[in-house]
């Protein structure tokens, strides 16, 4: 599995995301159901800023008024074509005013960033959060990390905790989902989840 030319900013990367999420067996089995349930449990009806929204897999199931942001313009267009509100990073950060959100989701974003750059990427979005907003950070465990050539740095719970603290957030909870932590070496879709508050 090769890294698409242009990495995660390329149209090829968007096509790869669409092909992976559109696999017939995944749709028939609704493999995303437990992950949607988990996000709803964590974010409830909060208007959420989905940073690194990709093609909108999570954004499509977030509450009304939620917005996606991604650095890949092709992925943002896929979201818009699906009726979702999404912006490129430059569009969102360059807008007039500062809309406020009650939640922020960064799911499967941080592991794609160059080592040490996660705080710099996420920090500009923190001022868009209301006081006490919920922040959810999600990264793959070992097997999931190895499944994508665009993953650059393995981010575990201590690294997520350090990132949250660097962003000035208060950590509420950290856990493995959907299976216990030891499954992360075998199950591609096991995730590290960190929940924090602004």
Regions found by a protein language model. Give the residues of each.
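Conserved beta-strand signature within the Rossmann-like core of class I S-adenosyl-L-methionine
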Residues: 132-140
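Acceptor-substrate binding/catalytic loop of class I
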Residues: 144-159
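Conserved N-terminal segment of class I S-adenosyl-L-methionine
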Residues: 1-99, 103-105, 122, 128, ...
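Short "lid" loop at the C-terminus of a central beta-strand within the Rossmann-like core
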Residues: 140-145, 179
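Core SAM-dependent methyltransferase catalytic element
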Residues: 180-198
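A short, conserved alpha-helix within the catalytic core of class I
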Residues: 113-124
């Amino acid at each position: 599995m090769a890294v698409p030319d242009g990495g995660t900013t390329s149209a090829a990367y968007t096509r790869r995301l669409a092909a992976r999420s559109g696999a017939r067996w995944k749709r028939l089995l609704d493999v995303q159901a437990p992950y949607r349930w988990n996000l709803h449990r964590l974010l409830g009806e909060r208007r959420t800023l989905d940073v690194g929204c990709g093609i909108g897999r999570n954004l499509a199931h977030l509450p009304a008024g939620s917005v996606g942001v991604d650095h890949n313009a092709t992925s943002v267009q896929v979201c818009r074509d699906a009726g979702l509100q999404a912006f490129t990073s430059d569009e969102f950060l360059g807008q007039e005013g500062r809309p406020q959100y009650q939640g922020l989701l960064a799911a499967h974003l941080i592991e794609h960033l160059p080592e040490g750059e996660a705080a710099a990427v996420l920090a500009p979005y923190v001022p868009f959060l209301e006081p006490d907003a919920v922040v959810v950070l999600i990264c793959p465990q070992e097997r999931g990390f190895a499944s994508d050539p665009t993953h650059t740095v393995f981010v575990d719970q201590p690294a997520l905790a350090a990132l949250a603290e660097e962003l000035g957030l208060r950590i509420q909870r950290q856990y493995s989902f959907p299976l216990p932590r030891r499954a992360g070496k075998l199950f591609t879709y096991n995730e590290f989840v960190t929940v924090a508050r602004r």
